[in-house]
Design a protein with these regions (language model features):
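Structural motif
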Residues: 132, 153-154
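Acetyl-CoA-dependent GNAT
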Residues: 14, 21-99, 104, 109-110, ...
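Conserved acetyl-CoA-binding loop-helix of GNAT-fold acetyltransferases
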Residues: 105-108, 114-127, 152-153
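Basic/polar N-terminal segments that are highly enriched at the extreme N-terminus
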Residues: 1-4
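Conserved catalytic-core motifs of GNAT/GCN5-like acyltransferases
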Residues: 138, 157-174
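Conserved GNAT acetyl-CoA-binding A-motif
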Residues: 129-142
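Short glycine/proline-centered loop/turn elements that form peptide/ligand docking sites
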Residues: 118, 122, 144-147, 164-170
């Protein structure tokens, strides 16, 4: 029987070896695109498979999140021996009423998807965001059909306000929000 443990990571725990068994793989067939103000599901096919460069960049990003007061949650199975998921929450409030905190990443290793791990991570991020004074989560999310299905399932909707810096960085991402109650 597998044991699953959720915990916050410290900056010192975020290192490349943490991701040695993590498989960020996605076979994308369809993506959402905005055309004339409407979201349309289009046939856009590609495979994403993170390699050493993506993981090095990720380590730098996650360390920065922690250094700037944000939080990185991790999910381990088998008593902490294997990372199967993580999520990061930034610490800078933004929006016209400083209502948003950014969920900057949430990923589940390929073989561990569909087990509720992502939903539990999302819930932990929400609890933390409330503690940090946010009224809403902001997510600049991959436009793939599967990714958007996850966010819809947890209750996310199109963001009322768009963070233009995030839109410019990833113009095909869907800008989402989640109300924290």
């Amino acid at each position: 029987m597998k044991t699953i443990n959720y915990e916050k990571l410290t900056k010192d725990e975020v290192e490349l070896s943490l991701f040695s068994n993590f498989n960020r793989y996605q076979d994308v067939k369809k993506c959402w695109r905005k055309e004339n103000g409407d979201l349309i599901l289009k046939e856009i096919s590609f495979t994403e498979q993170w390699g050493p460069n993506e993981y090095k960049h990720l380590v730098n990003c996650l360390k920065n999140t922690i250094e700037t007061g944000g939080t990185v949650f991790s999910v381990f199975e088998n008593n902490g021996n294997s990372l199967v998921g993580f999520a990061s929450l930034e610490n800078q409030l933004f929006g016209t009423a400083n209502q948003y905190l950014q969920l900057s990443s949430i990923h589940i290793s390929y073989k561990n998807r569909g087990m509720g791990i992502g939903k539990r991570l999302f819930s932990l991020v929400c609890e933390q965001a409330i503690e940090m004074g946010a009224k809403k989560l902001y997510i600049s999310a991959h436009s793939s059909q599967e990714t958007q299905a996850f966010y819809k399932a947890v209750g996310c909707v199109e963001a009322i306000e768009h963070n233009e810096a995030l839109v410019a960085k990833e113009p095909y991402d869907c800008q989402l929000e989640y109300g924290l109650f």
